[in-house]
Amino acid sequence: MLQNQSHTLIGVTKTAVFFLYAALAIIGFAIGYFIPQIAKWALSLPWIPLEGPLRLITSFQGSTASFITALLGMCAGIWFAHSVIAMLLSVKITDHTVEFIKGKKVQTIHSDDIALVFMDHKRLVLLGTAGYELVREEIDEKPVNVEKAFRQHHYEWATDGDPFKDQFRRWIPDAPDLSQGAHALLKARHKALQDEEKDDIEEFRLELAQLGIVVRDEGTRQYWRKAETYPPKIQLGEGL
């Protein structure tokens, strides 16, 4: 958690991002530099798959070849770091807005639209003024730090968690409580949960919110409740 007079940053900070890029680039460089020796050692084992490619790697000799494989390894490390960071969440909190930053995506929510903030297991939830969920995102931060950050900027924190938790019901396909449109979205979202398609899971959650349906998950099981009004439009933008 990073804090100054104007804002607090929780989750993945810029410092952590820098060190992740640096560490994986160095590791990739080292592996690339020593890959011919690693391949030679692997070929000494009683059985190893991909023997042909490994023999090709052992044919790389000399300082120039080692430098090229090291650069390739460093590029692979940077690419892997970029892929990891794109899945991690940072939250920038000010007195007036909360920004959810994941990769190049930024979701901005104004403080006037936020009624309550709480943690649901590892997920950070922002509740709107009429009971709808503005955001439900998994965050890599200690709950005590999350609570401290939001209280510091005068947001209402729910120590006991979701005040609507007793209203959630497990989704049953084609049950009469929901419209056909809501069932279609929940069915598609259930498949996305099974396939671990995170973008689709979130997109369907937002579409359900426009129907006045709040949804939460336990594994691939979905639980839902109705909100009193539709959520406001949420500002989306591009990150750094």
UniProtKB/Swiss-Prot annotation:
One Pfam family per UniProt: bPH_10
Any one GO CC term of the record: plasma membrane
UniProt keywords, alphabetically: Cell membrane, Membrane, Transmembrane, Transmembrane helix
InterPro entries: CysS_C
Domain of life: Bacteria
Residue ranges of the TM segments: 16-36, 67-87
Record protein name field: Uncharacterized protein YqeB
Topological relation to the membrane, as annotated: Multi-pass membrane protein
Subcellular location: Cell membrane
